[in-house]
Structure formats: C-alpha cells, structure tokens
UniProtKB/Swiss-Prot annotation:
This is Humanin-like 9. Plays a role as a neuroprotective and antiapoptotic factor. It holds the Pfam family Humanin. Induction: Down-regulated 6 hours following staurosporine (STS) treatment and up-regulated 24 hours following STS treatment. Down-regulated 6 hours following beta-carotene treatment, returning to its basal level 24 hours following beta-carotene treatment. GO terms for molecular function: receptor antagonist activity. InterPro entries: Humanin. Keywords: Cytoplasm, Secreted. It comes from Homo sapiens (Human). The lineage of its organism: Eukaryota, Metazoa, Chordata, Craniata, Vertebrata. One of its GO terms (biological process) is negative regulation of execution phase of apoptosis.
Length: 24
C-alpha cells in the first residue's frame, strides 16, 4: 500500500512539476 501511495505521489508531483519547468 505504501508503495502504491508513493507511486501515486510521484506521478502527481511529476505531472505538476513538468509543465511548470516547461513553462519557465
């Protein structure tokens, strides 16, 4: 369960981090 939560968090972070870096 912890692994699943980590993957979800990582995916969410990447999804929000990529557009921001690309925008800058």
């Amino acid at each position: 369960m912890a692994r699943r939560g980590f993957s979800c968090l990582l995916l969410s972070t990447t999804a929000t981090d990529l557009p921001v870096k690309r925008r800058t």
